[in-house]
Amino acid sequence: MRILLTNDDGIYAPGIKALRQVLEKEGKYELTVVAPDREKSATGHGITVHRPLRAFDITFKNSKVRGVSVDGTPADCVKLAVEALLDKPPDLVLSGINSGPNLGTDVLYSGTVSAAIEAMINGIPAIAISMGSFAFEDEEYLRAAEIFARLLPRILEHPWPRDTILNINIPNVPLEEIKGIAITRLGVRKYINVFEERKDPRGLSYYWMSGEAVNYENGQDTDTAALARKEISITPVHFDLTNYHYLNELKTWVKALEGALATG
């Protein structure tokens, strides 16, 4: 099986390193890493269209896996890999392991999730993998990678719709402390943001943003609630943002709107 690894934390980040090491050690997969050359978290699904992209082959210590560093976004990395860099499209794209969770409305900002969605747009099955809390030690990422590697063969036994990615959040705890696996929907996760104004040497203002996450909607079937219970959350996510519940009501506007076009 050909697997493309990517992320939004950068090609040298500990999460993607751990995932590569664990999957390479298993010897069952043909791996390629194409990832941003630097931190690209919270870049969403942006792509680069107003300048050229640069890609450089890199080598990983004690590894035979091909690596390509790209000066673009996570979505750029997947597009470039699939459409230009690889001889054959991958059978699967894995995005992560992200440093920190991607829960609820995080998925709208997440470069990790967006890379998986870009793969899905190209007809390739994809999984986004994130740590349930921010991790700082390589051992934490290796533990999460080993947990995911146990799950992957079982996941692949059950093909999922091609308009859908799987968004997986793994609690940052030892395997024996994980309480189970929950199939979840997205919760609502917002942030209380603070913008700190500073001055540059020319006296011009610039702003640093920081924020604290707030889980507004924590139904027991949400990803946020599952992670709080120390469960692995698996959420099917797709890019159709249509509000189907509101479609019929919106259709009642048509005559009035057409009337506005006909008058005056």
Swiss-Prot record:
What's the protein name? 5'-nucleotidase SurE
Where does the record say this protein resides?
Cytoplasm
* InterPro entries, A to Z: SurE (IPR030048), SurE-like_Pase/nucleotidase (IPR002828), SurE-like_sf (IPR036523)
The record lists a divalent metal cation as bound by D8, D9, S41, N98
Q: Which UniProt keywords apply?
A: Cytoplasm, Hydrolase, Metal-binding, Nucleotide-binding
Question: In the UniProt record, does the keyword Metal-binding occur?
Answer: yes
List GO molecular-function terms, semicolon-separated: 3'-nucleotidase activity; 5'-nucleotidase activity; exopolyphosphatase activity; metal ion binding; nucleotide binding
The transmembrane segments are none
The encoding gene: surE
Which GO CC terms are listed, alphabetically? cytoplasm
The catalytic activity of this protein is classed by the Enzyme Commission as: 3.1.3.5
Lineage, broadest ranks: Bacteria, Bacillati, Bacillota, Clostridia, Thermoanaerobacterales
UniProt cofactor(s): a divalent metal cation
Query: Does the keyword Hydrolase feature in the UniProt annotation?
Result: yes
Superkingdom of the organism of origin: Bacteria
The note on cofactor binding and number reads: Binds 1 divalent metal cation per subunit.
Role summary: Nucleotidase that shows phosphatase activity on nucleoside 5'-monophosphates.
Recorded catalytic activity of this chain's protein? a ribonucleoside 5'-phosphate + H2O = a ribonucleoside + phosphate
The record ties this protein, via Gene3D superfamilies, to: Survival protein SurE-like phosphatase/nucleotidase (3.40.1210.10)
- Give the record's family classification: Belongs to the SurE nucleotidase family.
A Pfam family the protein falls into: SurE
